[in-house]
From Swiss-Prot:
It comes from Mus musculus (Mouse). This is Lens epithelial cell protein LEP503. It comes from the Eukaryota. Pfam families: LEP503. InterPro entries: LEP503. The gene is Lenep. Transmembrane segments: none annotated. GO terms for cellular component: cytoplasm.
Amino acid sequence: MRPPTQPLTQALPFSLRDALRGTGLQVPVIKMGTGWEGMYRTLKEVAYILLCCWCIKELLD
């Protein structure tokens, strides 16, 4: 007898947004009133993506 199957969205241990965040394809969501905190978070994510790209380039060279 087969075990019951789960829909794919419930079977995955992560959300699509989390998966996209890991690949650097996250679409930034800008909220009004976040001020410097939002800017800091965005710059930190951009720096992280650039660092990952640089590391991959160095590994491939």
